[in-house]
């Protein structure tokens, strides 16, 4: 028998095309396959999204405050207007993410293992200090 949180993941994965405005705050979604999910305006605050597949997901205006997304795959996701305050992006793949800004990143936590889209330049001055620059496309 699967633990309750794994059953919940299966339920969420089955509805991934229709999760606009969903309340997924403070949920265990580790390793969830949410590739291509429509999470517009969803509440994912303080959720555990470690190693989750959010590639090409629409996270427009999603609340990811305090979400733990370490080693998650967000390749090609839309992060326009998403709240990333205190989100953990350590080792997260943000390659080809669209609508990500330095303003969002300055409120998040990440490390030198985090992969950024080509239009975001991160220059580290120490282990915890960086400057972020958005390049013109």
Write out the residue ranges for each language-model feature:
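Tandem repeat scaffolds
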Residues: 1-137
């Amino acid at each position: 028998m699967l633990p309750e949180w794994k059953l919940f993941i299966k339920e969420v994965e089955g509805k991934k095309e229709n999760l606009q405005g969903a309340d997924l705050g403070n949920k265990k979604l580790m390793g969830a396959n949410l590739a291509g999910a429509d999470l517009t305006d969803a509440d994912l605050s303080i959720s555990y999204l470690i190693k989750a597949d959010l590639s090409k997901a629409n996270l427009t205006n999603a609340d990811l405050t305090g979400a733990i997304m370490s080693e998650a795959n967000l390749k090609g996701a839309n992060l326009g207007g998403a709240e990333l305050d205190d989100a953990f992006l350590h080792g997260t793949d943000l390659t080809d993410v669209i609508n990500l800004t330095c303003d969002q990143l300055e409120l998040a936590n990440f490390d030198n293992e985090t992969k950024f889209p080509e239009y975001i330049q991160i220059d580290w001055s120490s282990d915890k200090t960086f400057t972020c620059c958005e390049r013109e496309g």
